[in-house]
Each structure stands twice: as C-alpha cells, then as structure tokens.
Amino acid sequence: MSAVLSTENGLILKLYIQPKASRDQIVGLHGDELKVAITAPPVDGQANAHLVKFIAKQFRVAKSQVIIEKGELGRHKQIKVINPQQIPPEVTILLE
C-alpha cells in the first residue's frame, strides 16, 4: 500500500509523525509513509489532537471527518479523511 490511497468517500493516509517539531508541516515521503511534523509533544494525546486539527485544516474538513484508524499510541498512523474539500500539493503528487 502506498502512503496515500483514494477511496470512494475520501482518502486514507499512512503517516509517520514527528512530534515536538519547530513547525507544523507535511514533510514528504518517509519510506512508504507520508512524514508529518507537528509542534505538539506526544503526551496525554496532545499530539493526536494537534495532528487531527492540522490535517483537518490542510484538507479543509471538520475535525470529525479526520479519523485515526490505526496507531493511536505510536508514530506510525493510518488516518482517514472523509470527503476532503482540498488536497495539499504534497499529497496530490502521491495520488498520481
């Protein structure tokens, strides 16, 4: 499976998370995953909440449309984005 998979109602993203980064950004490919740097620390779910907020903003969807399917407690996550209104350029490249 590639880092980004298109489904009938959205996208599935395989992510590698880098917490406590200097800024929030989609870095690029990291093996077969998409690397995302976030500023939040990996403590008490702060990184997950921050990641959901960041992904929702990037894809212009509500936070409720971003679901962490796998990897709640680790750096390797699988996230589903339901009906994205916009797709960031870093992700568009991987869909082609």
Swiss-Prot record:
Entries under InterPro entries matching the protein: DUF167 (IPR003746), YggU-like_sf (IPR036591)
GO cellular component: cytoplasm
PANTHER family: UPF0235 PROTEIN C15ORF40
Family: Belongs to the UPF0235 family.
Protein name: UPF0235 protein YPK_0828
Organism encoding this protein: Yersinia pseudotuberculosis serotype O:3 (strain YPIII)
Highest classification ranks of the organism: Bacteria, Pseudomonadati, Pseudomonadota, Gammaproteobacteria, Enterobacterales
